[in-house]
Amino acid sequence: MMFIDSHAHMLSRTTDDYEAMAAAGVVAVIEPAFWLGQPRTHVGTYIDYLASIVGFERFRAGQFGIRHYCTIGLNSKEANNEELAEGVMEILPRFALKEGVVAIGEIGYDEQTALEDKYFRL
C-alpha cells in the first residue's frame, strides 16, 4: 500500500524519519511552512527558510524515493511585524513557482489583528 503524508514538518526531522517513512510505504509528503518556535525578524530568515523547504528538503526526501511538496506563506505570528510582513509578501512570488510548491497561505490567526487580516487577504 502507498501513503501520502499530508502534513509533516520534515525540516525539523532526522533523515532516519524519511527512511522509516519509505519503508512504511510513504511515497509523498506535503510540508506546510510553519513558525520556527521563535519570531523571524528579518526577511532574510524567511528567504533561508523557504529555500530550505523548496530546495534542500525536496532533495533530502528524494534520496528515499519520497516526493516532497510544500506550502509557503506568511506565518500569523509574524504578520504583526509590518516591516517583516511587507518583505515576505515581496519575496513570496520568487518561491511560488518553484517545483513542489502546491499552495500559498497560512491557516488561522494568532491575535486576530487588523494586520493579520490584511496580509491574509493579499
Task: List each language-model region with its residue ranges.
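Mid-domain alpha/beta scaffold segments of enzyme catalytic cores
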Residues: 1-122
